[in-house]
Amino acid sequence: MAQQQQQQMQQQQQHHTSSINNNNSSSIVLLQQQQPQQQQQQLDQLQQYNNNLYSQNYNMEEYERRKRREREKIERQQGIQIDDRETSLFGEPRRLTEGDAEITAALGEFFEAREYINNQTVGISRSAPGAGNPRLQPNLAPQAKSLGHSPSSASSAAGPTAASATTSLPGQQQHYQQQQRPPTYVKQADNKPPYNGRGGYPGQPMKNDIPSSSGMAPPRGPPRTSSSNSNSSSVTNNASSGGVPASTPLGPPLSTQMPNGREKSFLGPPAPALHNGTGGRFVPPAASKRPGVGQQPPPPEKDVNKIISDIANIFTVQPLTLIAATPHAPTRENYNLLAPNRQKYAMDIPSSPPSAEPSSLMTPLFAPITSPIAPLVTTPPQASQMPLGGATSGTILAGEALAPLHQLPPTMPKAASGVTSPGPVKPLKTEKNHSLEKQDSCLENDLELSESEDEQRKKEGRSGGNSSNSSESDSSESGSESSSKNDLQHHPNHQQHHHQLQQQQQQQQATMQQQQVLQQQHRSQPLTSNGAQNKKFRHEIIARGSNTITGLLSSSGFGSGGNVGPAGVNSNAVVGTGSGSGGTLSSGGSSSNKTPSPTESNKWNLSRFFHKPANQTNSESVSPGNVSMKVPGILPGGAQIIPESIDVTTAIVKNEKNDMAMEEGEEEDDDEEQQLRYGGGLSVTPVAVKKEAIDAVSEMALGAIPKTQIKRESAETLLSARLSDSGTSASGSSSSSSSSSDSAMGGEVVPMPGPGETLQLPGVPAAITTVMRVQPTQSQKAPPSNSVTLTPILPLPTSPKQRQKKPRKKKAITSAPILDSSDDDEPPPKHPGLDHTAVSVQTQPATDTVKKGRGRPRKQQQSGGSGNLSSASAGSSSQTKGPTLTAAKKPLAKTPLAMSRARKREHSSQSSSNGNTPTKKVATPQLVAAPLKPTSNTAGSSSSDEDSSSSAESSSKSSSSSSSSDDTETQNTNCRIVKLNKTGAVQKKALLGSGSSSPSSSGSEAEDQTTRSQVGSGQALAQQLPPYKQLPISQHSQHLSSSDCSSSSGGCTAVCSSSSGEEDEGRREKERERKPKSDKNKINTLTRIFNPKEGGAKKQGQVVIVDLQEEQQQGKLDAAAQPSAPQAPPAAPAAIMAKPRMTPTQQQQLGAGLASPARTTTPHLTSLICKIDLSKLSRERIMRLKKLTPAQQNGHLTPKDQATNAVHVPNGYAGDTNPAAKVKHEHPVKPEPELDAGYEAKFKPGNVKQEFQLKQERDRDRERERERERERERDREREQPPGRRRKRSSSSSSSPYKEKKRKKEKADQLQMGKELLPVPVLLPSNNHERMPNHDRLSYDKLQLLHEDAAAVIGDVSAPNGSPTKKLLAMSPLPPPPTVTVAPATCNEAVQTTPPSATATSAIAPPVPATRLIYRSYFDRDVEHPSDDPRKNNQFLQEAINRKHAADLERDSFNQVTLYLEAVVYFLLTADAMERCSSEQATNTMYKDTLSLIKFISTKFRPYQQQSTTNIQHETHNKVAILSLRCQSLISLKLYKLRRKDCRAIINSLTDFFRVGRGDIANGNTPSSISPSNSVGSQGSGSNTPPGRIVPPDIHNMLCKQNEFLSYLNSAHELWDQADRLVRTGNHIDFIRELDHENGPLTLHSTMHEVFRYVQAGLKTLRDAVSHPTHQSQ
């Protein structure tokens, strides 16, 4: 080992020399500045440097890898091979000039930090890209020096600190040695920016979105917190997994070494400085750390010396072991031996072999953390931040430690070491990076920081933990930091920082709950060293925090995702999104609480990154992963993390100020309960702690990364239980936290098994926990609360109070587990009315009992109507669920629907921490909450607000209070609270919204949220909850649509209530599989729809999707049964919107139609609120259903929803027996299909009251309309022209590919319809026999008024067993939709609606007889291709690219298909040229294309002549058919282009032949020439046959005519050839299927139709070749 180490050191030094070349001078300066410590460190430098170099090798670029290869060669020569040489892809160094601002700032900021980092900080994840790598962590001690040389910019920035930490002489010597040895092999740094392309080099190890655990340096170097984040996470995980063991033997010193392989634990702040320096961005935080003093003396040298001595004594041996172990860890990480990036992100050291060693290190790290914890207690902000940062991410710890050092120089030695130990613990690679990035980006403005972090996290969450995104790293670090801080501060600083910490805790509630559970587990297991029990406890939390906190953080934040990796399920996803979420949450918590906190400003994360003054601690991005809610700490914004007991089951972190002490006591119980519940399979729905400074856009982005953002406890048991409970239990809540970036950081949706599964809507910050799906049968009924309340809360006055809502404790263990960080500072004000009104005690243990209702009991209640157990993870929502549910229900019934709406909005806005708006409160007076006074938490909405607030807090919570409770109102604007009042079907759609997060957990939470919203806003909703459950399926559909809307609306908290029942779960899972595809499109569409600036709330606007029917029902129908019936129709529209098959336009239209009324109807919110009536959605959906019902809407509708809602009425048309409850049609809100030719029927109610009245009218009319609709369905089936159905099909065919896919999914149904239809019928008169959408819509418009009621009736009659009729009745064109399922794709002539309807819906309505649909040629859709030349150029480029690819293709089939694709793209180009280019150019393009396709056809001939029994020949024959069709149409087009010329030629020739002009060449005609000549002429003429002389012009015309007519002849001839080949080759089924899906291809087809048709055919053929069993006939 000694030789190997030396070799490695030399090689690494060589590597270092190259990486140091850029950072050498800066690192030398740092070394010189820190010579005293460096001398002490020199002894340790060698080993540390070796470790650092070793870790760097994994972060190196090509030259570094070459060095590593050289080193490996040497090792092989010595018989030593490094297991991880494959994995050690060195993170590319960030090349920064010595004068680089980032480096300068980092060095200056980290001047003292460097000393500490060199001496103490091993866990500076940013210092070395490899820091995040388990293998790198052991080496991080040397990395202090190597960081100075680390290839990554982060390492270069932090490297100087590290180098200074190591003696400048030894560093130089090492550099010299390195240069001496590897110069031959080592490729010097080439100044190339880190390669971020595939995440290959800097982030290559991050195959599974693990940033740089493969040892790659952050791609962007210091500025890239993301890459650093991955490193940080890797380091954290490695430190915890690889470094912790060393840490245990080493004790605190090892702990310091562990994060970066250097002695980071003692110099926690310097280590963060290194991380920041490494990140390069964190230089400003360093500056803020020492703003006035360029070099503040590090903590007393005693500490430094002690650290150095400890490192020298302990680290000397440990580094070898760590180094020896590192190869394994990197290899495993890079190659995902056990799980994708499991080891990288998994802080569960025991689970990951590479992390096994770090596990030991982690314990010592925590021990060191404990020592700093005392100072942390002394300086709560710094201490909490430092331990959190350390525990969560080395980078954060380093940055934070530095900042606290600056602020508290005397305390900082301990705090720094404590922070440093957390740094090694930082298992959340991304967390660390997030925190750093936030520091980098938004240090100056907490709100700005949190928002930017949200966006960054979104990106990084999406990148799945890629190290390329620094914001993710930063936010993750922040979140991890916050979590660690919360954990550290939990006991000593709990009350001190309670307000500040509350916000962070609320943001990180889920994380804290998980962490606290782990803490409790680990509390029983005292940490290795460092004295105080609190410290021990914190260290335990942190040490486990690597394992558990990181797991928790991983579930809560991106960075911590790694911990989940060992747990296995969402390791990768958790990491990427988790850190982003964590970062946002962390920053949100910081901002929301105390934006400027001198201690926080001293943090390395933000102050260093932003060069901010030490006192100006802008909210560091505290991502749930970064901030350890368990450890009390101060978040970057000054928010204190008061560790609240992590209730795993509750998944809500107690964060109420009043109950903080009690919460601490309860935390353990809650943690235990959470563990039990998780183990028990209950999905805990800790709603993500509300983050104050969340950008709605960031929210959306985070929402997109729900899984990665999922907080998961590192404890594998908890993770397993959680994961098993909700396939993405953490994802729901943590994704909500991550979606709300800032708002939902703490919130974590712990998957509640079965009905309690937690859904995380991707676009919805709030995690939705489905409470018990007690009434699967009821789910058939359309719950009155089909309404989706999407309340994106824009900057409302002061909504942080809502954040105060206690996370609802399941089983009342954690009274405020989910207390939203948003209101941490003002929890009492937030809930003055809310807490007192709904339960009067959100922050009190009594609330906990109420929260029991929130917990599992709430699921029980859900059956009772308040099924949103998880919906409001916050304690307030649990309060609502408890007694408030019934209270709310009664008032709601009594209160007018407007009141219920107001409550919904109020409590939505409140939950989005916009609850400050008294308007909302007033709107929801009906609630138990006489204390409407918490304006944001109106009395009525107090419980509802708690629910909404808990869910919204997890979602909007962060967004509204993203920066700080007070500050975030502006930022809150992005928040949306989507309250889906229907319980049954929500999970399916919640899944759609949830995206990657587990739909069930999200759905359950949504359900809870919905229930809470209903309960809070109108407790009558709670009464309706049983109807919701009764109609869970239809509700589910609606929830999905609203969920989609909310997620698409960006900030929208799509809370889908999925309490339908076990049936719904099965259906939801089916929908989960189907819907996600179209969910993205839907989300995009809905985002556009709801962007306040763009007529919607694109991640910013407030959208309230409310089922007006539901509200009306609540107001009108005290009985839940009636409300359930009216809500069934809204559920159907929701299903339509949620249905993945639905085309984006349809979704957009649906969303738009709903959005208009929503906006109009929700004046209560200060910010824009789009109130979408689901009943309206139902109509639109019904219209779509008309087209799509038979074929399951071609996937546009919600066939999945229907299947899932089989018991319910298909397509969200719950068979509600209560017609009154169903939304009639809101007649005032008429769909204006003509306005939107597609499906976008815009319902424009005159006002909210009118809508309510309409709903009430629906209640009356629905029963009548039931019969009417049944008759209409029959009549329509008979009468409605196929054209209309075609129309729908054509509109659906607007997205032919989606429709094709959907139809393929429903191939059986489609085939049924096809079989029923004769071929001629299947091929209608022409391709374009699609009724114009306008015509259809106009027809629909007329019928919508009728069908609105009919739809309600249909929903009501769905229980009667005629869902298809209902669908038809509900749909403006019920018969066409039935028939149109197949035609919906395009021009399908015939379609059987009843079969599709029956197939789609569990309830089999009477199947109408098969009907043939005939479409008129004039009904075809008129396409208006764009004249944009850019698009034409795009087509041309696509064609050229495909042709070149085909030229190089060797496989005959692939070549032919590529050529044919190129041809159709050329056709699109030529078609576009017809409108913007000359006729000649267009003609040339077509001619060239024809020549190309003729050339292609030569490749088919060999196969066409052979037997078609061969699959290959069959496929070639089919391609030949498509080719012949294309040739025919191109020939016809060439003729049409010349038709005018041809006509003129024909006229001229006709005249010529009629007049008989032209001389006879050899006749008796006398010659005018002389006789002598005449004889000769005659003699010569006698040689020519007699004939007529044709003038040249006539000859030319004849030639042209021949050419033109040959085109025409070829067109028909080629077409006939294709037809013959179809018949002879027995390919009729293949063509028929294409015709059904894309409309028949005829000689009238446009080039766009040809393109669509051919592309569909080629795709089918490719699929057939890839999967022969599935190839079409």
From Swiss-Prot:
Q: Which residues carry this modification: Phosphothreonine?
A: 420, 1364
**What are the start and end residues of every segment in region (Disordered)?**
1-24, 54-80, 125-302, 407-534, 575-604, 722-1086, 1114-1133, 1141-1160, 1187-1315, 1564-1588
Name one cellular component (GO) term.
super elongation complex
Q: Which InterPro entries match?
A: AF4/FMR2, AF4/FMR2_CHD
Which regions are flagged for Acidic residues bias?
443-454
Q: Which GO terms describe its biological process?
A: learning or memory; neuronal stem cell population maintenance; periodic partitioning by pair rule gene; positive regulation of transcription by RNA polymerase II; regulation of cytoskeleton organization; regulation of DNA-templated transcription; regulation of gene expression; regulation of lipid transport
Q: Where is the composition biased (Low complexity)?
A: 146-180, 223-244, 465-486, 501-525, 724-757, 860-898, 949-965, 993-1004, 1034-1060, 1564-1583
On the tree of life, the source organism's domain of life is Eukaryota
List residues annotated as DNA-binding: 851-863
Keyword DNA-binding in annotation: yes
Q: What happens when the gene is disrupted?
A: Embryos lacking maternal lilli show specific defects in the establishment of a functional cytoskeleton during cellularization, and exhibit a pair-rule segmentation phenotype. Adults lacking lilli exhibit reduction in cell and organ size and partial suppression of the increased growth associated with loss of PTEN function.
Per UniProt, the ranges with Polar residues bias are 594-604, 775-788, 909-919, 1011-1022, 1190-1205
Keywords assigned by UniProt, alphabetized: Developmental protein, DNA-binding, Nucleus, Pair-rule protein, Phosphoprotein, Transcription, Transcription regulation
Q: Which residues carry this modification: Phosphoserine?
A: 450, 452, 821-822, 871, 873, 1362
Compartments in which it is found: Nucleus
List all Basic residues biased stretches: 491-500, 802-812
In what ranges is there compositional bias, type Gly residues? 577-586
What family is this?
Answer: Belongs to the AF4 family.
What does the annotation say about its assembly with partners?
A: Component of the super elongation complex (SEC), at least composed of Ell, Cdk9, cyclin-T (CycT), lilli and ear.
As for what it does, the entry says: Has a role in transcriptional regulation. Acts in parallel with the Ras/MAPK and the PI3K/PKB pathways in the control of cell identity and cellular growth. Essential for regulation of the cytoskeleton and cell growth but not for cell proliferation or growth rate. Required specifically for the microtubule-based basal transport of lipid droplets. Plays a partially redundant function downstream of Raf in cell fate specification in the developing eye. Pair-rule protein that regulates embryonic cellularization, gastrulation and segmentation.
Q: What is this protein's record name? A: AF4/FMR2 family member lilli
> Can you name the source organism?
Drosophila melanogaster (Fruit fly)
Q: Gene encoding this chain?
A: lilli
